[in-house]
């Protein structure tokens, strides 16, 4: 039992380290803050249209699920997946894809950086 507990504790530490590293990378890549991004994601009501595993208020089905954004090739159906493009899409989706169902919600550039940091951590 002690060996199993020690192995479990070791795996927990490994997973925690991996998550911390993912958060650091997302913040460095986007210039945003993951925790503020999760709060902004909720505040702007993004979860009303989009699902994100592990985020209780994000269970929408109108828009695509937002897990795995970091590994997608394209953002908004048109742009290369780069932080600046994701942020542009979040701030003004109509400028990227006129007629898209995603509305312009008044997201500030600072909030878009934070939301993009949050999304890049969702696997």
Outline where the language-model segments fall.
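C-terminal capping alpha-helices of c-type cytochrome domains
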Residues: 1-16, 95-123
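A broad, low-specificity signal for short, low-complexity segments enriched in glycine/proline
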Residues: 8-11, 24-29, 63-65
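Short strand-loop junctions, especially beta-strand C-caps/beta-turns
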Residues: 69-72, 105
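Periplasmic/extracellular electron-transfer cofactor-ligation site
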Residues: 30-32, 38-65, 72-80, 88-100, ...
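Electrostatic cytochrome c docking/interface patches
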Residues: 14-42
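Generic hydrophobic-segment detector
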Residues: 3, 26-27, 50
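Stable alpha-helical elements in mature extracytoplasmic
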Residues: 33, 82, 86, 111-115
